[in-house]
UniProtKB/Swiss-Prot annotation:
Signal peptide: none annotated. This is Glutamate--cysteine ligase. The lineage of its organism: Bacteria, Pseudomonadati, Pseudomonadota, Gammaproteobacteria, Pseudomonadales. It holds the Pfam family Glu_cys_ligase. PANTHER family: GLUTAMATE--CYSTEINE LIGASE (PTHR38761:SF1).
């Protein structure tokens, strides 16, 4: 343990400060495809009974009309976050009729690209803009890639904790700048160590053969309809997913907030030749919002993002620049197909400890060589993380994954102890023990467990459909309370009314609306 981490832990362990760790906030976003009872992509519109995908706070769509996204609020206890996520699932299942929620991250057998429906958000200008943005994603990356689902884990530490540490360390930055710098330092450490999360929680070692759609790849055939890599942990996070030459130059090393926002400013304002050639329109039909490297900031694909809640009409870069970093969004977590929610409480407890470790441990700037090694380690683990004797790069030297993983878990142990002291019980130590067991025995990892079942003769699709049916039974077995049901019904009703109100307002010319939106991007790109 570094001296800096020891000092910070000792300070937070003082009786007057211990309660601060109970004020961390959590939120979860879970994506999942709607499928029919045969495991085929549901081509039906977003169910109106779920409310408006444009305005509902908890239930929306991601890329496709068939790709649901469930969003929790924030809570200090991840158990409450998961309870809310579960209630959203139960309400959704009540409205899905005979449809199912697909259990893994990698999609079901997909129809041809033209048939995959892009999400629609109504006739308002903002609704149409969201649709055109998704048309641009299809043009740039293909629809198939947009059907991959994941879990996003949002996490923040209380401002009082940052202020306490700033005072004790004699830092003279503004409170906002210090907090932002500490979150960016957390992200640097996350880049160093996130390969560990892929080993422990990666759950996508195989996929439906049709996913590759004839594109070249290095995957092996497990059966007539399943492709895999024998030691993979997360094909979802491998380079078979978002292969974007346009984004290849966008690899900020997160040495400060300004360098991150500057790289995004440049990307949203710089034309990319292939996109320029395609153009923004074909006749009167919009193809993409613009021809820049990124149409909007959120198009940038990364395993973690610094975030700040935006005001109405405000862009993410503007929020970060004017008010600093508020929380981080972890975006690399696979959906665990063995779990109804795709994530459980022990995993959430461990991620809390892991992120707290990243926040409190010393985090030197990432030099270019180390930045590249972080990317290389991550890609190596997602494609062959369970390979016996696999070595990674640490400080320019080779180290066995198992050795480094064991060392990291030992370094996280004091964080788990501190969290348990703060909150009572031993839930974090128990969550850590589960992860130590996976390092000791690779067969306990979710990716190994998926392949163990597939090797018994099930195809990826058969396995995924079986899990989806089991989870549907779980959610439908216990209905919501009358009070919860009424709250969800009201939220759905209110969201539809809000969309209708938006669409009833005079909206002006859509081309002018997009031009104004583009002008806001250009204003950022300075």
């Amino acid at each position: 343990m570094s001296d800096l981490l020891s000092r910070r832990l000792a300070q937070l362990g003082e009786p007057a400060n211990l309660s601060l760790l109970g004020e961390c906030l959590h939120g979860i976003e879970r994506e999942c495809l709607r499928v029919d009872h045969d495991g085929q992509l549901a081509l039906t519109p977003h169910p109106q009974a779920l409310g408006s995908a444009l305005t509902h706070a908890q239930i929306t769509t991601d890329y496709s009309e068939s790709l649901l996204e469930f969003i929790t609020g924030t809570a200090t206890d991840p158990a409450a976050t998961l309870a809310e996520l579960e209630s959203i699932h139960r309400f959704a299942y009540e409205k899905l009729g005979g449809e199912l929620l697909w259990s893994p991250s990698m999609p079901c057998a997909l129809p041809d690209e033209e048939t995959i429906p892009i999400a629609r958000y109504g006739s308002s200008n903002i609704g149409r803009l969201k649709y055109v943005y998704r048309k641009g994603l299809a043009l740039r990356y293909g629809k198939t890639m947009q059907c991959i689902a994941g879990i996003h884990y949002n996490f923040s530490l209380p401002e009082a904790l940052w202020q306490l540490q700033q005072r004790s360390e004699g830092n003279t930055q503004s409170t906002r700048d210090y907090q932002s710098a500490r979150y960016i330092a957390l992200i640097r450490n996350f880049r160093r160590y996130s390969w560990l999360l892929m080993y422990l929680f990666g759950a996508s070692p195989a996929l439906d053969k049709g996913f590759m759609r004839g594109r070249p790849h290095q995957l092996q055939e497990l059966d007539a309809s399943t492709l895999y890599l024998p030691y993979a942990t997360s094909l979802r996070m491998s380079d078979l997913g978002y292969q974007s030459s346009a984004q290849s130059g966008l690899t900020p090393c997160y040495n400060d907030l300004a360098s991150y926002t500057d790289s995004l400013r440049l990307a949203v304002g710089t034309p990319y030749p292939a996109y320029v050639e395609a153009g923004t329109k074909r006749g009167d039909e919009w193809l993409q919002l613009n021809t820049n490297i990124l149409q909007i900031e959120n198009e940038y694909y990364s395993s973690i993002r610094p975030k700040r809640v935006t005001y109405s009409g405000e862009r993410p870069i503007q929020a970060l620049t004017s008010r600093g970093v508020q929380y981080v969004e972890v975006r690399c977590l696979d959906i665990n197909p063995f779990l109804p929610l795709g994530i459980d409480l022990p995993q959430a407890r461990f991620i809390d400890a892991f992120l707290l470790f990243c926040a409190l441990e010393d985090s030197p700037l990432l030099e270019s060589g180390e930045c590249g090694a972080c990317t290389s380690n991550f890609l190596k683990v997602v494609k062959e993380g369970r390979r016996p004797g696999l070595h990674l790069q640490r400080d320019g030297r080779s180290i066995e994954l198992k050795t480094w993983a064991s060392e990291l878990l030992e370094r996280i142990h004091p964080l788990c102890e501190l969290l348990d002291r703060s909150q009572g019980g031993n839930a974090h130590i128990e969550a850590l023990a589960q992860q130590q067991a996976k390092v000791a025995d690779v067969e306990m990892t979710p990716s190994a467990q998926v392949l163990a079942i597939l090797r018994q003769g099930q195809s990826f699709t058969e396995f995924a459909l079986q899990q989806s049916l089991r989870h549907a039974e779980y959610f439908r077995a216990e209905p919501l309370s009358a009070e919860q049901q009424q709250a969800f019904e009201q939220a759905a009703h209110d969201s539809l009314a809000e969309q209708a109100e938006l669409e009833a307002q005079p909206k002006g010319d859509f081309d002018a609306f997009v031009a104004a939106y583009q002008a806001s991007i250009l204003a950022l790109a300075v």
